Structure formats: structure tokens, C-alpha cells
Amino acid sequence: MVAAQAKLVYHLNKYYNEKCQARKAAIAKTIREVCKVVSDVLKEVEVQEPRFISSLNEMDNRYEGLEVISPTEFEVVLYLNQMGVFNFVDDGSLPGCAVLKLSDGRKRSMSLWVEFITASGYLSARKIRSRFQTLVAQAVDKCSYRDVVKMVADTSEVKLRIRDRYVVQITPAFKCTGIWPRSAAHWPLPHIPWPGPNRVAEVKAEGFNLLSKECHTLAGKQSSAESDAWVLQFAEAENRLQLGGCRKKCLSLLKTLRDRHLELPGQPLNNYHMKTLVSYECEKHPRESDWDESCLGDRLNGILLQLISCLQCRRCPHYFLPNLDLFQGKPHSALENAAKQTWRLAREILTNPKSLEKL
């Protein structure tokens, strides 16, 4: 048994050093190329409208606010200033979303975003995005990369297609630090010793983002309050949970396997599903020793089996907001197909670790 585990870990490490590192290098190169174009577009936006200031800065070889959805798809979060005159209201009526309401006694004129405040005193995510979309469309025509970049049509999101190969979504957002949403108040679970109190404090201090984007849970329910709502996102908090042991390596293996074998019709699976399942695996295996290099095979296998279970149940709860289903809106046939493919992949890796050389 120990010999079989060691053999699997050996082949996973080989796969990581060859395939995962090559994937990382290729994506890093793409990110540099894509960010040059996005920065140029945002610079042009800022000239037209100084309230939209580019926050796409490179620090320690990574760009703040950039998320890799897949090797050809990215999201750039554009942090906006001055949320201060608004109260964050998160009553759970819109799963995964919250609203920003003008604080009592504050005048509209005190806000930097005065014309985007609704009659009821809410800062409208939709109105801000609509204005931003108009500015980006104008900037694309003026910027120095105008020959290689164009807007993606037929969406209220701000999406750029670059060199006909890459899609980048630019999402206006507010950063919320030092507060924690009520809809995530159950976390951490009291009976689970992971993460420890110090990491919990770090994660909560990191806070979350409020994004102006289409909320999939509200599809078909377009009342004005809902289209004015902001989507909760916990990217930095989630990144902190992946620190230590072989967690990041495990996630890198899962992303690479997804890119190569689970890029399927209907797009049932993305990197974020993998990241979510690593967090759940951490809860199931709370001891640091469970994430030792020697356990890499067990952890990967556990996550793949959990993924199959989620696909078969057609439900993958968000880690911090379990009322939010990450498979919402995905075609059932696509989820069934993904379950079969994941099962084949898991069986292949477990019964014949050497097969990783060809995967």
C-alpha cells in the first residue's frame, strides 16, 4: 500500500514538474501580453473619466485583481474608490449578492458616484457597469492596440477579445476589508479545527470584493433591486486558505488536468470549482500532516471523487456561501458528461499512475 502511494506521488510530482510548470509558464507569458493591452485600454478610459482609475499593477510577478479562468480566459477586477458613504447590506435574500445603500444622513452629493444612485438610495452595480462599458468601447477605438482588441458584443459584461485568442472580462469592484459578510458568518465551522484561529483572522482581515457583474443566481429574475446588486467574491481570502503543505501543488495538478481533459461542451467545470473543492478537502483533512508531500496522491484522489459526487448531485456549494450553487445554470447533460470523464480520469490515475505520462 505504501509502495503504491509512493509510486503515485512520484508520478504526480513528475507530472507537476513537466506539465503543470509548462502550463504556468505559458499562462504567465499570456498574462503579460494581455495585461499590456488591458492597461492601455484602461489608461484611455482614465483620460475620459478619472473616477475609473486602473488598479492593474504588477507586484511580485503577479497582477493584483487578475484571475485566471482558463488558459485563454481571464478576469481583471478594477477597484473603485470611495465606498465609504454606503452601507453594505447583506440580508441573504439574493444568494451570493449584496447591495450598497446610502448611509442614513448622508447626502447623495457626498458620493463620488452620485449619478449611479437609484431613487431608493442604492448604488447600482448595473448603472456603473453600463457607463464603464461605454467608456471601454470608446477607449478600444482610440488605444494603441486597437488593431488587436475588440469588445465582445451581446453581453452587459465588459469583455475584450484580444488577438482573437483571449477573452478578458474587466469588472468594476469595491474592496471590502475589515468587515465580513453576514451570509458567511457560519464560517469557520465550530467543530472543524481547520483553519486555525490565526489563519481565520488573516482571512477575515483580507475581506472580500463586491463585483459589478451579472449574477447567475438571478437569471430570469430581473427586478431592479436585483440588477442593482453586487456579487460577493473572496479571491484573496481563498488564496490564503491554499497556503501550506501540498495544497497549492494539488490545485495546480487539478487545474492542469481540467485544462487538458475536462474542457467540455457546455463548460461545466472551471478552475474555480477546483479551488473550491481543495478548500472542502482541507476541512475533511484538517491536520497539517494530511497535506504532507507523501499524501499528495490521497488528497488528489479524494478531491476527484468529491468532484464526481458533486457532478452527479448537480450541486457544488460555494465554500464561503453554501446557499450559492456553483453549478447553477449548467446543462444537466454537460454535468453528467463531466462526471463520466472525471471518473475515467480518476480511475486511470489511481490504477495506473504511469498513465500520467500520457495525460
UniProtKB/Swiss-Prot annotation:
**A molecular function (GO) term:** metal ion binding
Gene3D superfamilies from the UniProt entry: 1.10.1410.40, 3.30.460.90
Which residues are noted in the entry as Mg(2+)-binding?
73, 75
User: Is the Disulfide bond keyword given for this protein?
Assistant: no
List localization entries.
Nucleus
Q: Which InterPro entries match?
A: Mab-21-like_nuc_Trfase, Mab-21_HhH/H2TH-like, MAB21L/cGLR
Instruction: Give the UniProt keywords, A-Z.
Output: Developmental protein, Magnesium, Metal-binding, Nucleotide-binding, Nucleotidyltransferase, Nucleus, Transferase
The alphabetized list of GO BP terms reads: cornea development in camera-type eye
Describe the task this protein carries out.
Answer: Putative nucleotidyltransferase required for several aspects of embryonic development including normal development of the eye. It is unclear whether it displays nucleotidyltransferase activity in vivo. Binds single-stranded RNA (ssRNA).
Describe the protein's quaternary organization and the partners it interacts with: Monomer. Homodecamer; composed of 2 back to back homopentamers. The protein may exist as monomer in solution and oiligomerizes upon ligand binding.
Q: Which family does it belong to?
A: Belongs to the mab-21 family.
State the protein's name.
Putative nucleotidyltransferase MAB21L1
